[in-house]
Amino acid sequence: MSGCPYFQRKFLSTSKQHLKEEENDEAQTGINKASKGGLIYGDYLQLDKIVTSQVLQSELKGNKIHDEHLFIVTHQAYELWFKQVLWELDSVREIFISGHVRDERNMLKVNTRIHRIVMIFRLLLDQFAVLETMTALDFYDFREYLSPASGFQSLQFRLLENKIGVPHNQRVPYNRRHYRDNFRDQESELLLHSEQEPTLLQLVEQWLERTPGLEEDGFNFWGKLEKNIFEGLRREKEHIEQKPASERKEEMLAELIKQRDIFLSLFDEKRHDHLVSTGQRRLSYKALQGALMIYFYREEPRFQVPFQLLTSLMDIDTLMTKWRYNHVCMVHRMIGSKDGTGGSSGYQYLRSTVSDRYKVFVDLFNLATFLIPRDWVPKLDPSEHTFLYMAECCDSSYCSSSDDSD
């Protein structure tokens, strides 16, 4: 320290000022509770297990490859998020299974958890960008150490597919074998059990079938909609036929015939059942009616929350399809047309899974096929408006449950 008396006086004065400021600093008035023992951050999260679970196969073989660590951490992060998605999905399914969804107060809880799944999948899509900082040559350096491990063997992702409602008969065979053949013992049993449980699709289907307003002896939405649509098509045909002969007139009549055929199929229950049997439709005939009713009356307070749920279910399907596509692109970029480490055809197999076969809520997407002018939608008179608002009290299918759900 300098021998200058002036400097010493200024230094001491400044130090005392800082000490005084620290004594009066409200940001420093807390108590360090961790110093007194008890549960601390690392113990609560069991970080000793998580951060030491990255075992590099290349290092075990005496040839440590730097980027294998990124590969492991990224996939472990995927699995942790899959675990959270399953946690949310199981809770939503339990609300439906227990009947608590009939208490409309629980619909907010359902919507919140389904929306959380949507947000997780958006995060998982972004995660590919981190993995793609590794080049194909970087991956090649340690790929030989991974076989026969394969992403197809992700138990949690297969459970997720099953619990959402991917039909096992719509799956693309894996090397001409049933997908469960690639899992052992307890894992195979868990997958079989998940196939036998009610899926989210089935539970949503049952919920849609109870949509108030579908009753033939009540509002009779379906009967009124059918009448309005074909009356509207008849008026359109008369309007077009009044136009002078032209190529445009013929095109308009041809388009009208196509529209009529589309709506004939919509109101043909036998045709619907046939499309369900071939996998082109997934929802029951009555559930489709409920979904379309929610779609048309989405601005009514009674149907705003259900419409948000249907939108989120489509978001999940969309994001899972994008996830598959991003995975396909990444695999193609990393290994080209080589076989996968698990023995599949790699890129070729993965590309075949990016299709509507794996879309669970495809019927919700197809609702847009049946869009009609707003004035064709059956009008609600004042008493019917009241019915919609009071549905949870008046409709036995939507009556409030006295039970609480988690």
Swiss-Prot record:
It catalyses: L-tryptophan + O2 = N-formyl-L-kynurenine. Binds 1 heme group per subunit. Its EC number is 1.13.11.11. It is an enzyme of class 1 (oxidoreductase). Transmembrane segments: none annotated. GO terms for biological process: L-tryptophan catabolic process to acetyl-CoA; L-tryptophan catabolic process to kynurenine; protein homotetramerization. Pfam families: Trp_dioxygenase. SUPFAM superfamilies: Indolic compounds 2,3-dioxygenase-like (SSF140959). Pathway: Amino-acid degradation; L-tryptophan degradation via kynurenine pathway; L-kynurenine from L-tryptophan: step 1/2. Substrate binds at F71, I72, V73, T74, H75, R143, T341. The keyword Cytoplasm does not apply. Keywords: Dioxygenase, Heme, Iron, Metal-binding, Oxidoreductase, Tryptophan catabolism. One of its GO terms (molecular function) is tryptophan 2,3-dioxygenase activity. Its cofactor is heme. Homotetramer. Dimer of dimers. Heme-dependent dioxygenase that catalyzes the oxidative cleavage of the L-tryptophan (L-Trp) pyrrole ring and converts L-tryptophan to N-formyl-L-kynurenine. Catalyzes the oxidative cleavage of the indole moiety. Belongs to the tryptophan 2,3-dioxygenase family. This is Tryptophan 2,3-dioxygenase A. It comes from Danio rerio.
